[in-house]
Structure formats: C-alpha cells, structure tokens
Amino acid sequence: MENFGIVAFVLFIVALVFIVKTIKVVPQQDAWVVERLGKYHATLGPGLNIVVPFVDRIAYKHVLKEIPLDVPPQVCITRDNTQLQVDGILYFQITDAMRASYGSSNYVAAITQLAQTTLRSVIGKMELDKTFEERDHINTTIVNAIDESAANWGVKGLRYEIKDLNTFILAANAHQQVEIHSHRQSVPH
C-alpha cells in the first residue's frame, strides 16, 4: 500500500510537469515562434496555446508593440563638405514573427545600419542649409528605405526622428572654412 502512494505521487508530479509543459499562455501584443524538432512549426498568438511537450520548444519571443531604437550619433558630410553630427531615433514594429526570427540573424543591428547608411546618403546629397529645412524629407526617406529592405526581416519602420543636428569644424578644416567664408564675403554680389 505504501508503494502505491509513492507511485501515485510520482505519477501526479509527472502529469503536472506534462501539463505545465503543454499549456503556454502568450501575453497580449506578443508572438512566440515554436520549433518542432529544430524546424519552424508555428507562431503562437496571444492567449492559451497548446504545444507538444519535449518535441516543441519556444525558440523566439517577440513583442509586437512599437519599439523605439536609439540610432547612435554619426558624422555625415554634406554636399558643400560641412560635417554634421546627426543623432536620431527610429520607431519600428515587428509585423511577422517568423521572418523576424529567421530573416536576419540580428534585425535590430540590420535596421540600425540601414538607417545610418541611408542618413549619410541623404545628407550627402544636400547642402548644409537644406539639411535643417528638410528634416521631414530626411525622416521620410529613411523610413521608406527601411520599409523596402526590412520586409524580409518581418519588421516595419514606423517613423524616424532626428533628435539633434550639430555642425562642427575640425581643426584641420577650420582654416579652409574661414578662407572660403572670407572669399565669399569679398566677392561682390
């Protein structure tokens, strides 16, 4: 009789572990990617979900809310050879959890690099005066470039905001900039 109690207790514990491993509750605005034996099987949406224990595993957990990403400040050179330090923030959202998991090894680094290279390209085509006036154009161009490329990564760029635009002149270029400025002042208009 004593053995029956121990066996019943062990079976109860095994059943409890089985139930805990089977039932998964995904929070609202989340998506979990399930792999079955190492291969993509399904994406679990919010609510109560059932998986096969010891065969299925939760490989990735993604938040589907809007995510702010601080893009590191970088130096950009305008068409008139003025250096700007530009600091911005990118807002994005995961639209496809499966693609976000398998489309890129690191989608955050990928969209950060894409935002930086697009920013350098756009500012390189403008003169200094235009960069301050055309902030909205710069922001829109960056978001469009991210949307084009990031669709394969399961990510959508929502908006990009330039936080800070700072001009600075390096010591080596200071003399040249002063000469150009004085030459412009001496030429009659």
For each feature predicted by the language model, list its residue ranges.
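Prokaryotic Sec-type signal peptides and long signal-anchor helices
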Residues: 13-16, 172, 186
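Single-pass alpha-helical transmembrane signal-anchor segments
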Residues: 2-23
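Amphipathic, interface-forming alpha-helical segments with heptad-repeat character
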Residues: 34-45, 49-177
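Assembly-interface segments of oligomeric complexes
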Residues: 177-189
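A general, composition-driven signal for non-globular sequence regions
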Residues: 15-18, 30, 119, 178
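Transmembrane-cytosolic junction motif
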Residues: 17-37
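Feature targets compositionally biased, intrinsically disordered low-complexity regions
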Residues: 4, 44-46, 183
